[in-house]
Amino acid sequence: MKIVDANVLLYAVNTTSEHHKPSLRWLDGALSGADRVGFAWVPLLAFVRLATKVGLFPRPLPREAAITQVADWLAAPSAVLVNPTVRHADILARMLTYVGTGANLVNDAHLAALAVEHRASIVSYDSDFGRFEGVRWDQPPALL
């Protein structure tokens, strides 16, 4: 399973981004493929928050469109909603201890912990995922 980070979701809908085409191509292909695509609430909520933010994109999505997009992704046959297990708090603490910080890496550490719990990899443009011990991650162009 591959768990999708918010930046891939945002690039997939932002047609002005240089990462739009590889992100959309990977996401569409993954959602129509046989392998599971993991979605977690933190990246999904970040997508809704940022995709609808005036001034961030040339044409922010209307709230309804962003919510519908999330629903469409989750309705795909290969989509799986990934939730923390009972081991999550311990794994999350280990991830934060390993990188020696919290702050801006807390959400990344949460996603990294989910990946470890579910034996998944992360798809993201954020190289910070390379800092977490035992976490596999790829950028969409490398997966095409």
UniProtKB/Swiss-Prot annotation:
It comes from the Bacteria. The keyword Metal-binding applies. Mg(2+) binds at residues 5, 90. It is found in: Secreted. Its main location: secreted. One of its GO terms (molecular function) is magnesium ion binding. Residues 3-137 form the PINc domain. Its cofactor is Mg(2+). Keywords: Hydrolase, Magnesium, Metal-binding, Nuclease, Secreted, Toxin-antitoxin system. GO terms for cellular component: extracellular region. It is an enzyme of class 3 (hydrolase). One of its GO terms (biological process) is negative regulation of growth. Its EC number is 3.1.-.-. Probable toxic component of a type II toxin-antitoxin (TA) system. An RNase. Upon expression in M.smegmatis inhibits colony formation. The putative cognate antitoxin is VapB37. Belongs to the PINc/VapC protein family. This is Ribonuclease VapC37. It comes from Mycobacterium tuberculosis (strain ATCC 25618 / H37Rv).
